[in-house]
């Protein structure tokens, strides 16, 4: 279908929202609600209720919208999160107390001895506890309130991270999944509003509408520029849920030690 030159799809600049995303998909395809209802097998009145009255779809209507828009499994899961009540976040201080009680510092110390990056993150990608290797790899993290996304927007991160823009896009996709779950929590809203003040984050967020990442393993390494090395250092990250505390992710970073002057 040819679109007029003046047509521009709307952005999804705000916190993740099911009803906003349904309208975004409609506008991005330049379709009327009537045409979507007909093609998806939904009554026009029901679709209008979903959008205008912000009602929750039943399973059949939900499935038909997912199929009509060709959503990926991750996008479907994101919609499912958005239709569930927002979850409360456990405070960073409380999560740190739990980690200390589990003596995770002992594990971090062992990782330092083997030159392996180690850290524990909350759902908003704030480093709750990290070892010396992590802080060496991420200079100035403390000045970003220990939040990885905020750190990525600093000059230090731009200098350190090879392929910085692509990494920022990946973080935006990961953040969208977390904000979908915790969207009404004041900490989540405060972080999002803080990030929106940065033009690079706004560009990354607005440029990846409906793009989400749930898979924890990374298929490719993260490349860092390290002083004294001729090539960017390939850091292979392993990310898993911390079994002793489901709200926490544990991160390990592996690289070839001969490649860096320790």
Give the positions of each predicted feature.
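Short amphipathic recognition helices of helix-turn-helix/homeodomain-type DNA-binding modules
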Residues: 3-5, 60-99
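Conserved hydrophobic/aromatic packing and binding residues within compact polymer-binding modules
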Residues: 22, 36-37, 47-50
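Short alpha-helical "recognition helix" segments of helix-turn-helix
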Residues: 33-39, 65
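Recognition helix of helix-turn-helix/homeodomain-like DNA-binding domains
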Residues: 41-57, 66
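Short, basic/aromatic recognition patches
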Residues: 89-118, 195-221
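PAS-family sensory domains
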Residues: 116, 123-215, 254-262
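Low-complexity, glycine/alanine/valine/leucine- and proline-rich hydrophobic stretches
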Residues: 212-262
């Amino acid at each position: 279908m040819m679109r007029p030159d003046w047509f521009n799809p709307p952005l999804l600049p705000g916190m993740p929202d099911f009803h906003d995303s349904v309208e975004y998909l409609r506008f991005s395809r330049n379709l009327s609600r009537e045409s979507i209802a007909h093609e998806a097998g939904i009554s026009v009145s029901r679709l209008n209720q979903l959008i205008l009255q912000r009602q929750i779809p039943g399973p059949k209507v939900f499935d038909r919208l997912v199929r009509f828009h060709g959503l990926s499994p991750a996008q479907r899961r994101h919609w499912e999160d958005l239709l569930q009540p927002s979850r409360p976040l456990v405070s960073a201080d409380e999560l740190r107390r739990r980690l200390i009680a589990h003596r995770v510092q002992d594990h971090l110390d062992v990782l330092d001895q083997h030159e392996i990056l180690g850290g524990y993150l909350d759902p908003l990608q704030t480093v709750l506890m990290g070892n010396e290797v992590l802080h060496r790899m991420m200079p100035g993290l403390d000045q970003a309130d220990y939040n990885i996304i905020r750190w990525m927007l600093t000059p230090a991160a731009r200098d350190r991270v090879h392929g910085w823009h692509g990494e920022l896009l990946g973080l935006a996709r990961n953040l969208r999944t977390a904000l979908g779950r915790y969207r009404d929590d004041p900490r989540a809203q405060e972080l999002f509003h803080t990030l929106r003040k940065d033009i690079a984050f706004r560009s990354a967020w607005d440029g990846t509408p409906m793009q989400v990442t749930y898979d924890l393993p990374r298929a490719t390494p993260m490349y860092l520029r390290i002083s004294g090395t001729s090539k960017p250092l390939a850091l292979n990250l392993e990310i898993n849920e911390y079994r002793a505390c489901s709200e926490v992710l544990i991160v390990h970073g592996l690289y070839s030690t001969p490649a860096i002057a320790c």
